[in-house]
């Protein structure tokens, strides 16, 4: 199965969610001085939303750098976003921004660490998404 590619800050919220999903995953490095992640096959991006309710700064800088690499962007097939409902209309806005700019489907959104239901939905949805891509 093709991987999930994700970014998680030092809070590790997205990392913990990805660990619970249990599917193959690659992590975008936190520190920009670490070696850049280069993908070699289609993937779904899992991204947290930042900015405290504003669209400015909603997409983490590391994700912007990753997607600004045309090689990495070419393999993007969908996006899943994490967020905080306290952000109101900007809840999971990073997913909206990336889906629109990269012209890929926005597959799912979840709050903070996600619930057991979110984990099951993402696991099932990602599996079905890749099966549909190969038929």
UniProtKB/Swiss-Prot annotation:
<dbReference type="GO" id="GO:0036211">
    <property type="term" value="P:protein modification process"/>
</dbReference>
<dbReference type="Pfam" id="PF07972">
    <property type="entry name" value="Flavodoxin_NdrI"/>
</dbReference>
<comment type="function">
    <text>Probably involved in ribonucleotide reductase function.</text>
</comment>
<dbReference type="InterPro" id="IPR029039">
    <property type="entry name" value="Flavoprotein-like_sf"/>
</dbReference>
<protein>
    <recommendedName>
        <fullName>Protein NrdI</fullName>
    </recommendedName>
</protein>
<comment type="similarity">
    <text>Belongs to the NrdI family.</text>
</comment>
<dbReference type="InterPro" id="IPR020852">
    <property type="entry name" value="RNR_Ib_NrdI_bac"/>
</dbReference>
<dbReference type="GO" id="GO:0010181">
    <property type="term" value="F:FMN binding"/>
</dbReference>
<dbReference type="InterPro" id="IPR004465">
    <property type="entry name" value="RNR_NrdI"/>
</dbReference>
């Amino acid at each position: 199965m093709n991987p999930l590619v994700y970014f998680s800050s030092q809070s590790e919220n997205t990392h913990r969610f990805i660990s619970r999903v249990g599917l193959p995953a690659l992590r975008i490095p936190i520190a920009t001085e670490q070696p850049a992640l280069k993908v070699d096959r289609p993937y779904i991006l899992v991204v947290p939303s930042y900015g405290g309710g504003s669209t400015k700064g909603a997409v983490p800088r590391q994700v912007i750098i990753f997607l600004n690499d045309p090689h990495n962007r070419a393999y993007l097939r969908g996006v899943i976003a994490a967020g905080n409902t306290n952000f109101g209309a900007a809840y999971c806005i990073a997913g909206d921004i990336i889906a629109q700019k990269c012209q890929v489907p926005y597959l799912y959104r979840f709050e903070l660490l996600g619930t057991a239901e979110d984990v099951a939905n993402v696991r099932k949805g990602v599996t079905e998404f890749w099966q549909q891509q190969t038929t």
